[in-house]
C-alpha cells in the first residue's frame, strides 16, 4: 500500500452492489484508510484486463461477482499471472449449493438487481393499494392496474392486497345501497379492467345476520331476505353497467380468485420467481 490506503475494486458483470457491499462490510472490521471502487457491467475480457492493470498500479485487491464461468476464470487466471489478489465471493456458495442440491447454477447475470426492482415495484403497488382501499383517493384511481368492486364482506381488501403483493396496483370500491358509483370510476369503463365480486345469497344472509346481531338489532328474516336480494340485484346492475368481470367468491379462496383475474386480464405481474 504505497499511499497507506487499502484499495479494493468491486467488480461485477451486473450492477456491482453485492460486491461493493461485501467489500464495505469486510473493511469495516479493520482500522484502515480505504478506497472502494465499483466496476459495473464488466462482460468482456478487455474490460477485465484494464481493471487488473489498474489494480496493479494501485496495489488493489479485487473482489468480484462475475457469474459467467468463462469470464470468471479469465479474471482469476489473469490476476494470478499479474500477482493481484482476486476473490470470487460467489464461487464457494455456488459450490456448496450445487453439492447440497445436485443442481447446477444457471449463471444468469443481474438477478439481484432484478429482485431489487421487483421489491420496489411490489412496495409501490402495496402503497397504492392501501391508499385506494374502500373508495379512497378517487382523484388518482385512473393510475390503477385493476379496479375491484364488491359488496361489503366479499373480501375486496384481502384480494386487493394479494394482488398488490404481485406488483399490481389495485383500487377497490364498496357497492352500497342507494350509493351512486363515482364518475371517476364510470369514466374508466373499458380503459381499466374492472372486477365485480359477488357471493351466494345464503352466505350473504348469514353475514348480514351476524352484523345485525353485533349491533343488537332485530334480524327479521323476511325483511333481511328482501334487503339482501335487493343488495345483490343492485350490485349486478352496476357490474353490467361497468362491464365488470363478475366473480363469485363464495367457495374460492383469495389465491384462486387472484389467479382467475390475472389470467383473464393478462395483468402486468411485476413479481416473478426464478427457479435456480
From Swiss-Prot:
Its EC number is 2.7.11.32, 2.7.4.27. The keyword Lyase does not apply. It comes from the Bacteria. Pfam families: Kinase-PPPase. ADP binds at residues 150-157. Keywords: Kinase, Nucleotide-binding, Serine/threonine-protein kinase, Transferase. GO terms for molecular function: ADP binding; ATP binding; phosphotransferase activity, phosphate group as acceptor; protein serine/threonine kinase activity. It catalyses: N(tele)-phospho-L-histidyl/L-threonyl-[pyruvate, phosphate dikinase] + ADP = N(tele)-phospho-L-histidyl/O-phospho-L-threonyl-[pyruvate, phosphate dikinase] + AMP + H(+); N(tele)-phospho-L-histidyl/O-phospho-L-threonyl-[pyruvate, phosphate dikinase] + phosphate + H(+) = N(tele)-phospho-L-histidyl/L-threonyl-[pyruvate, phosphate dikinase] + diphosphate. Coiled coil: none annotated. Bifunctional serine/threonine kinase and phosphorylase involved in the regulation of the pyruvate, phosphate dikinase (PPDK) by catalyzing its phosphorylation/dephosphorylation. HAMAP family: PDRP. Belongs to the pyruvate, phosphate/water dikinase regulatory protein family. PDRP subfamily. This is Putative pyruvate, phosphate dikinase regulatory protein 1.
Amino acid at each position: 500500500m504505497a499511499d497507506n490506503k487499502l484499495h479494493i475494486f468491486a467488480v461485477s458483470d451486473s450492477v456491482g452492489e453485492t460486491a461493493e457491499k461485501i467489500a464495505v462490510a469486510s473493511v469495516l472490521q479493520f482500522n484502515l484508510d480505504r478506497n472502494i471502487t465499483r466496476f459495473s457491467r464488466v462482460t468482456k475480457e478487455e474490460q477485465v484486463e484494464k481493471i487488473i492493470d489498474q489494480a496493479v498500479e494501485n496495489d488493489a485487491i479485487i473482489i468480484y461477482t462475475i457469474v459467467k464461468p468463462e469470464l470468471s476464470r479469465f479474471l482469476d487466471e489473469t490476476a494470478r499471472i499479474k500477482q493481484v489478489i482476486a476473490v470470487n465471493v460467489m464461487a464457494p456458495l455456488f459450490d456448496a449449493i450445487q453439492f447440497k442440491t445436485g443442481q447446477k447454477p444457471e449463471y444468469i447475470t443481474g438477478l439481484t438487481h432484478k429482485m431489487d426492482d421487483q421489491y420496489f415495484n411490489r412496495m409501490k403497488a402495496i402503497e397504492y393499494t392501501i391508499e385506494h382501499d374502500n373508495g379512497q383517493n378517487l382523484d388518482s384511481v385512473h393510475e390503477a392496474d385493476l379496479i375491484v368492486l364488491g359488496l361489503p364482506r366479499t373480501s375486496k381488501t384481502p384480494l386487493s392486497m394479494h394482488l398488490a403483493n404481485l406488483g399490481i396496483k389495485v383500487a377497490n370500491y364498496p357497492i352500497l345501497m342507494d350509493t351512486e358509483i363515482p364518475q371517476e370510476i364510470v369514466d374508466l369503463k373499458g380503459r381499466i379492467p374492472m372486477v365485480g365480486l359477488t357471493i351466494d345469497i345464503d352466505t350473504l344472509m348469514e353475514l348480514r345476520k351476524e352484523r345485525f346481531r353485533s349491533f343488537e338489532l332485530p334480524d327479521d328474516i323476511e325483511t333481511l331476505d328482501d334487503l339482501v336480494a335487493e343488495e345483490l340485484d343492485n350490485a349486478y346492475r352496476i357490474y353490467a353497467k361497468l362491464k365488470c368481470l363478475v366473480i363469485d367468491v363464495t367457495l374460492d379462496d383469495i389465491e384462486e380468485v387472484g389467479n382467475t383475474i390475472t389470467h383473464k386480464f393478462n395483468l402486468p405481474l411485476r413479481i416473478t420467481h426464478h427457479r435456480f
